[in-house]
């Protein structure tokens, strides 16, 4: 079984798949859990990329789930075969969460993955102003060390190419203790200088100018997204600055088809965006911010409790930094449950 000739990206197939998915949307059943999660995520859209090693899902099933099969060269086998990656259309709200629930079941039943695979999360409807971009970049640099303790060591030090590197300190906005006391001119200068450094990093060596800027959204590196080195960090700002769909991509997660892990990761990353949006004064003035602080601030202690428990469980699981990824891990992924919500 196969899909014939596939492309390496999903953009061209999104309109068709979205149209078919929407024609089935009245049949999507929403549970109380789906509704609760969607309320926490608010107005953000979300799309996921599930890398696999083996498996096949027929088009009638894919279309109902808003899934698009693509090729991923990073997964190429020694035989030359390129396994499939399954990419969702942009999803939103309780029906989007319900769809992820259904996708989780189908992927678990029909696909397998290994250590070379990942799950990537795109979140859309995010702010695009310079203040947010600077705040988000600095926040992710602040939490990345703690975030990596929730994943096995191979995500930090893979054998081959690292597709989810840590953000470099060179491009991070400086901590500024008197942020609240800056006048408008000082604030504009701080944000502008910070943004220009981030733009230089994301554009792979260009400061904003007439040819390359936020309005024309042209990336200096042409000839395929895989040539853009700034994509391959634990958070990817390239689509936010240079693509029409304006999303942030979170690339760190290990491969999974487990709905508990998917939902928790979506809530954790959404919380990062909310915190960077509403509390830039805290981001710019503090050198240390914990994930627990962020979750409590964004969701409130009662709603955050289960997500914090999940984070602690992940840290405990990988405290010995076990690197193997065999049948034990695949079975754990299939059967893992935690009443987070």
Model-predicted segments: where are they?
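C-terminal accessory/tail domains of diverse enzymes
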Residues: 2-114, 126-341
């Amino acid at each position: 079984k196969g899909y014939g000739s596939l492309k390496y990206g999903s953009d061209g197939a999104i309109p068709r798949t979205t149209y078919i998915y929407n024609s089935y949307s009245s049949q999507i059943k929403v549970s109380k859990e789906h509704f609760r999660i969607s309320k926490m995520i608010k107005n953000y859209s979300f799309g996921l990329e599930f890398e696999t090693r083996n498996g096949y899902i027929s088009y009638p099933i894919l279309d109902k789930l808003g899934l698009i099969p693509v090729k991923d060269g990073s997964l190429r086998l020694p035989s030359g075969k390129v396994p499939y990656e399954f990419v969702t259309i942009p999803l939103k709200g309780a029906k989007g969460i319900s769809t992820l629930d259904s996708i989780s079941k189908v992927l678990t039943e029909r696909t397998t993955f290994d250590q070379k695979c990942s799950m990537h999360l795109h979140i859309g409807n995010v702010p695009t102003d310079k203040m947010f971009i600077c705040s988000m970049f600095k926040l992710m640099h602040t939490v990345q060390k703690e975030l990596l303790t929730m994943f096995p060591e191979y995500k930090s030090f893979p054998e081959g190419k690292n597709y989810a590197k840590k953000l470099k300190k060179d491009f991070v906005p400086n901590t500024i203790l008197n942020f609240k006391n800056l006048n408008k001119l000082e604030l504009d200068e701080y944000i502008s200088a910070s943004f220009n450094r981030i733009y230089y990093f994301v554009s792979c060596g260009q400061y904003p100018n007439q040819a390359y800027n936020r309005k024309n959204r042209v990336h200096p590196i042409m000839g395929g997204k895989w040539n853009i080195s700034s994509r391959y960090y634990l958070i990817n700002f390239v689509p936010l600055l240079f693509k029409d769909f304006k999303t942030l991509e979170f690339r760190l997660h290990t491969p999974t088809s487990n709905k508990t892990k998917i939902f928790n990761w979506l809530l954790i990353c959404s919380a990062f965006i909310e915190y960077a949006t509403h509390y830039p004064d805290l981001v710019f003035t503090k050198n240390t911010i914990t994930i627990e602080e962020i979750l409590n601030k964004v969701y409130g202690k009662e709603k955050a409790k289960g997500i914090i428990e999940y984070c602690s469980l992940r840290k405990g699981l990988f405290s010995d930094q076990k690197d193997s990824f065999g049948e034990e891990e695949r079975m754990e992924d299939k059967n893992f449950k935690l009443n987070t919500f």
